[in-house]
Amino acid sequence: MIALETKNLSKKYKKKLAVNEVTISLEEHKIYGLLGRNGAGKTTLLNILAGQIISSSGSVSVFGENVFENSKAMRNICFVKVKENINLSSKVKDVFYLCNMFYENWDQEYAEELIKKFQLNAKEKYYDLSHGMQTIVGIIKGLASRAPITIFDEPTTGLDAAHRELFYELLLEDYSEYPRTIILSTHLVEEVSHVIENVIILKEGSLAVQSSVEDFLEKGHIISGHKDKVTN
């Protein structure tokens, strides 16, 4: 079943075309890696997919329904941003309370388990957290949401190696038990190569590649490099 689909999706800012005629189809219960250099249009595309901004042209559908101004479709999506729209004075536990109110599949027990595993102080105010701990709040939101479509934009920003490894371990563990469509947008390409099943590559706002990782590698491409370099 198709979980998310775009047709001829474009977003223009004045004279700059950030996303250019992107047509993709994402299946249910698969993990996708969204790759590309800085400025390739990844974050803009994700914001459109999550209904955060409106495209200039084209369409986005989630399980066959238009995503824009559609609360039912929006509840199927959890979008974890680099900078979350969180009231800085809110306590961490209150952030998760709101998540519990919004996401139909929210698992509070699992969220509390993750809080312990990441050693996060749920009584602390969000603005008092380190950058890495703020990132972890987003990670817990994404994992515990159990949303049918879960999107992570640069999910390991500010995390040390141990916490990055823990995130991917928990992601795969939870995905195996509660399958869903997951999109990981990252510049740490080699770090996600063992996690993703399918690869989507944007180049200057246009779709360059969409295929399974296996087919992509069989055709002689290389997924490697520092700072979001994708070479072939």
Mark where each language-model region is:
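Helix-to-loop junction immediately C-terminal to a conserved catalytic motif
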Residues: 50
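Helix N-cap at the start of a conserved alpha-helix in ABC-type nucleotide-binding domains
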Residues: 161-163
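ABC-family P-loop ATPase nucleotide-binding domains
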Residues: 81-137
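Catalytic Walker B motif of ABC-type/P-loop ATPase nucleotide-binding domains
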Residues: 150-154
